Amino acid sequence: MGYFDFQKKSDCIVCIDSDGCAMDTMEVKHRTCFGPQWIKTFGLTEHEAECMELWLSINLYSITRGINRFKGLALALAEVEKRGLGNIEGLAEYEAWTKEAKELSNPALLAVTQKSDNPCFEKALLWSIRTNRAIHALPAEDRPFPNVKSAMDAMAKQADLAAVSSANREAVEAEWGRHHLAEDCSALLTQEAGTKA
Protein backbone atom coordinates (compact mmCIF):
# COMPACT_ATOMS: atom_id res chain seq x y z
CA MET A 1 0.00 0.00 0.00
CA GLY A 2 1.72 3.16 -1.17
CA TYR A 3 0.84 6.63 -2.26
CA PHE A 4 1.34 5.95 -5.96
CA ASP A 5 -1.04 2.98 -6.12
CA PHE A 6 -4.00 4.56 -4.30
CA GLN A 7 -7.29 3.34 -5.77
CA LYS A 8 -10.30 5.50 -4.97
CA LYS A 9 -13.23 3.43 -3.67
CA SER A 10 -15.38 6.20 -2.21
CA ASP A 11 -16.32 9.81 -2.96
CA CYS A 12 -14.88 10.77 0.40
CA ILE A 13 -11.43 10.39 1.94
CA VAL A 14 -10.60 10.80 5.61
CA CYS A 15 -6.95 11.51 6.45
CA ILE A 16 -5.80 10.56 9.93
CA ASP A 17 -2.57 11.82 11.46
CA SER A 18 -0.58 9.15 13.27
CA ASP A 19 1.59 10.43 16.14
CA GLY A 20 -0.52 12.24 18.70
CA CYS A 21 -3.85 11.71 16.91
CA ALA A 22 -4.32 7.99 16.25
CA MET A 23 -1.24 6.75 18.10
CA ASP A 24 -0.25 7.76 21.62
CA THR A 25 3.46 7.94 20.76
CA MET A 26 4.57 11.57 20.70
CA GLU A 27 5.69 11.91 24.32
CA VAL A 28 7.88 8.82 24.39
CA LYS A 29 9.43 9.47 20.97
CA HIS A 30 10.36 13.07 21.73
CA ARG A 31 11.57 12.42 25.29
CA THR A 32 13.61 9.30 24.54
CA CYS A 33 14.55 9.59 20.86
CA PHE A 34 14.27 12.97 19.11
CA GLY A 35 15.39 15.22 21.98
CA PRO A 36 18.30 13.15 23.33
CA GLN A 37 19.65 12.44 19.84
CA TRP A 38 19.45 16.15 18.98
CA ILE A 39 21.43 17.08 22.08
CA LYS A 40 24.02 14.38 21.38
CA THR A 41 24.44 15.02 17.65
CA PHE A 42 24.69 18.81 17.90
CA GLY A 43 27.00 18.77 20.95
CA LEU A 44 24.57 20.45 23.32
CA THR A 45 25.21 18.27 26.40
CA GLU A 46 26.58 21.24 28.35
CA HIS A 47 23.06 22.72 28.22
CA GLU A 48 21.18 19.41 28.20
CA ALA A 49 18.31 20.31 30.55
CA GLU A 50 17.57 23.65 28.87
CA CYS A 51 17.86 22.15 25.40
CA MET A 52 15.54 19.27 26.27
CA GLU A 53 12.98 21.70 27.66
CA LEU A 54 13.32 23.76 24.49
CA TRP A 55 12.89 20.68 22.27
CA LEU A 56 9.77 19.54 24.11
CA SER A 57 8.28 23.02 24.05
CA ILE A 58 8.62 23.30 20.26
CA ASN A 59 7.57 19.76 19.42
CA LEU A 60 4.97 18.93 22.08
CA TYR A 61 3.75 21.90 24.09
CA SER A 62 3.15 24.74 21.64
CA ILE A 63 1.30 25.60 18.45
CA THR A 64 4.08 23.86 16.50
CA ARG A 65 3.23 20.46 18.08
CA GLY A 66 3.51 17.76 15.43
CA ILE A 67 5.73 19.82 13.15
CA ASN A 68 7.86 17.93 10.64
CA ARG A 69 11.08 16.77 12.34
CA PHE A 70 13.33 18.82 10.04
CA LYS A 71 11.32 22.01 10.57
CA GLY A 72 11.24 21.38 14.32
CA LEU A 73 15.00 20.93 14.25
CA ALA A 74 15.42 24.25 12.43
CA LEU A 75 13.31 26.05 15.05
CA ALA A 76 15.22 24.43 17.91
CA LEU A 77 18.63 25.24 16.42
CA ALA A 78 17.62 28.86 15.80
CA GLU A 79 16.54 29.11 19.43
CA VAL A 80 19.86 27.62 20.57
CA GLU A 81 21.66 30.43 18.75
CA LYS A 82 19.21 33.07 20.00
CA ARG A 83 19.75 31.99 23.62
CA GLY A 84 23.53 31.89 23.18
CA LEU A 85 23.74 28.16 23.88
CA GLY A 86 25.77 27.43 20.78
CA ASN A 87 26.75 28.49 17.29
CA ILE A 88 25.26 26.31 14.56
CA GLU A 89 27.40 26.55 11.44
CA GLY A 90 25.34 26.46 8.25
CA LEU A 91 22.01 27.05 10.00
CA ALA A 92 20.72 29.74 7.61
CA GLU A 93 21.09 27.45 4.59
CA TYR A 94 19.46 24.57 6.49
CA GLU A 95 16.53 26.80 7.54
CA ALA A 96 16.07 27.88 3.91
CA TRP A 97 15.99 24.23 2.81
CA THR A 98 13.25 23.41 5.35
CA LYS A 99 11.15 26.26 3.95
CA GLU A 100 11.75 25.61 0.24
CA ALA A 101 12.19 21.84 -0.22
CA LYS A 102 9.32 19.94 -1.81
CA GLU A 103 10.08 16.93 0.39
CA LEU A 104 11.46 16.88 3.93
CA SER A 105 12.80 13.36 4.47
CA ASN A 106 16.07 11.50 4.92
CA PRO A 107 16.42 10.79 1.17
CA ALA A 108 15.80 14.45 0.33
CA LEU A 109 18.27 15.59 3.00
CA LEU A 110 20.86 13.09 1.79
CA ALA A 111 20.55 14.47 -1.75
CA VAL A 112 21.15 18.06 -0.63
CA THR A 113 23.93 16.99 1.75
CA GLN A 114 25.80 15.30 -1.09
CA LYS A 115 25.83 18.61 -3.02
CA SER A 116 26.92 20.79 -0.10
CA ASP A 117 29.72 21.19 2.44
CA ASN A 118 27.21 22.43 5.01
CA PRO A 119 27.87 20.81 8.42
CA CYS A 120 24.31 21.57 9.55
CA PHE A 121 22.92 19.37 6.75
CA GLU A 122 25.32 16.58 7.71
CA LYS A 123 24.45 16.75 11.40
CA ALA A 124 20.72 16.96 10.64
CA LEU A 125 20.94 13.79 8.57
CA LEU A 126 22.98 11.99 11.23
CA TRP A 127 20.50 13.12 13.90
CA SER A 128 17.54 11.87 11.86
CA ILE A 129 19.18 8.49 11.24
CA ARG A 130 20.06 8.13 14.93
CA THR A 131 16.51 9.11 15.85
CA ASN A 132 15.05 6.49 13.52
CA ARG A 133 17.31 3.86 15.09
CA ALA A 134 16.23 4.92 18.59
CA ILE A 135 12.55 4.77 17.58
CA HIS A 136 13.07 1.33 16.05
CA ALA A 137 14.68 0.17 19.32
CA LEU A 138 11.74 1.34 21.46
CA PRO A 139 9.85 -1.49 23.12
CA ALA A 140 6.62 -2.26 21.26
CA GLU A 141 4.51 -0.63 23.95
CA ASP A 142 2.96 1.96 21.65
CA ARG A 143 -0.78 1.95 21.41
CA PRO A 144 -3.57 3.78 19.65
CA PHE A 145 -5.71 6.13 21.66
CA PRO A 146 -8.92 4.54 22.98
CA ASN A 147 -11.63 3.90 20.36
CA VAL A 148 -9.41 4.73 17.37
CA LYS A 149 -9.75 1.25 15.84
CA SER A 150 -13.53 1.13 16.22
CA ALA A 151 -13.88 4.66 14.84
CA MET A 152 -11.71 3.75 11.85
CA ASP A 153 -13.71 0.56 11.25
CA ALA A 154 -16.90 2.65 11.14
CA MET A 155 -15.40 5.34 8.88
CA ALA A 156 -13.96 2.75 6.48
CA LYS A 157 -17.51 1.63 5.65
CA GLN A 158 -18.28 5.07 4.20
CA ALA A 159 -14.95 6.59 3.11
CA ASP A 160 -11.43 5.84 1.98
CA LEU A 161 -9.00 6.23 4.88
CA ALA A 162 -5.40 7.37 4.69
CA ALA A 163 -2.78 7.64 7.39
CA VAL A 164 -1.00 10.98 7.02
CA SER A 165 2.16 11.41 9.02
CA SER A 166 5.38 13.39 9.04
CA ALA A 167 7.02 10.30 10.56
CA ASN A 168 9.07 7.90 8.46
CA ARG A 169 7.28 5.14 6.58
CA GLU A 170 8.92 2.25 8.44
CA ALA A 171 7.69 3.51 11.82
CA VAL A 172 4.13 4.14 10.61
CA GLU A 173 3.91 0.75 8.88
CA ALA A 174 5.15 -1.00 12.02
CA GLU A 175 2.85 0.84 14.45
CA TRP A 176 -0.27 0.77 12.28
CA GLY A 177 0.33 -2.86 11.31
CA ARG A 178 0.90 -3.99 14.90
CA HIS A 179 -2.44 -2.49 15.97
CA HIS A 180 -4.40 -3.47 12.83
CA LEU A 181 -5.06 0.15 11.84
CA ALA A 182 -3.43 -0.21 8.41
CA GLU A 183 -6.02 -2.76 7.31
CA ASP A 184 -8.64 0.03 7.14
CA CYS A 185 -6.40 2.34 5.10
CA SER A 186 -6.15 2.78 1.35
CA ALA A 187 -2.84 4.66 1.71
CA LEU A 188 -0.08 5.38 4.22
CA LEU A 189 1.24 8.85 3.44
CA THR A 190 4.48 9.50 5.31
CA GLN A 191 7.31 12.03 5.14
CA GLU A 192 8.61 10.34 1.98
CA ALA A 193 5.37 11.31 0.19
CA GLY A 194 5.92 15.03 0.83
CA THR A 195 4.44 17.54 3.23
CA LYS A 196 0.99 17.43 4.79
CA ALA A 197 0.08 20.75 3.16
Report residues per predicted region.
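Short, acidic, Ser/Thr-enriched surface-loop or helix-capping motifs
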Residues: D17
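Alpha-helical substrate-recognition element adjacent to the catalytic core
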Residues: Y3, K9, C21-E170, C185
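Extreme N-terminal starter segment of soluble prokaryotic enzymes
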Residues: S10-V14
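Substrate-recognition "cap/lid" segment bordering the active-site pocket of phosphatases
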Residues: A162-A197
